[in-house]
Amino acid sequence: MIEFDNLSEKKDNQHITLENGNVFLTNYQTIVITVNCAGVMGKGIALQAKDLFPDAFLYYKDLCDKDKMHMGVPVLYNKRSNSLQTTDKEYKKLLLFPTKQHWKMPANIVSIEKGLQWLVDNYKKCGIKSLAIPALGCGNGGLEWRDVGPLLYKYLGKMNIPVQIFLPRQNIPKKHLTEKFLLTEPPKITDY
């Protein structure tokens, strides 16, 4: 875990930590699952989610088959299994977060930003009390942490709940893990 101490800019984002490891091992209430809109959970975090939560996969597949999974609009799935309770005895929630239209395509940072705004606007209404989120679009999506990190920090910093950001497995320069870097304004959507 990487926490930021003794930084004057840290006033608003004290609830965010950067984590190495497996997002599914968190004790946080809500886990973000990166998905596409084609109904396929074939690689990465999505495949792990399919194996761990087959009921969530069926729900997600049904949404895709009915054309109800859209870029920029995450969907909350309330897990109803006793095996995945959080420390406060609430059931896990899974937030299905589209990062790609089709599994063959790269991740879309414009839609990721729209989805993050949706999350900021709706997390209270959805009852999200703590959030574990991977580096959206990094890994199989082909995006770079240097672009995604500041974007995540910008939006998740607006949420008044504990947030764990799970870092991608790629080597990240140490300067891209600093508070100073993460507080920089992310690239404008028009830059893509």
Predicted region positions:
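Macrodomain-like recognition of ADP-ribose-binding/processing modules
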Residues: 1-192
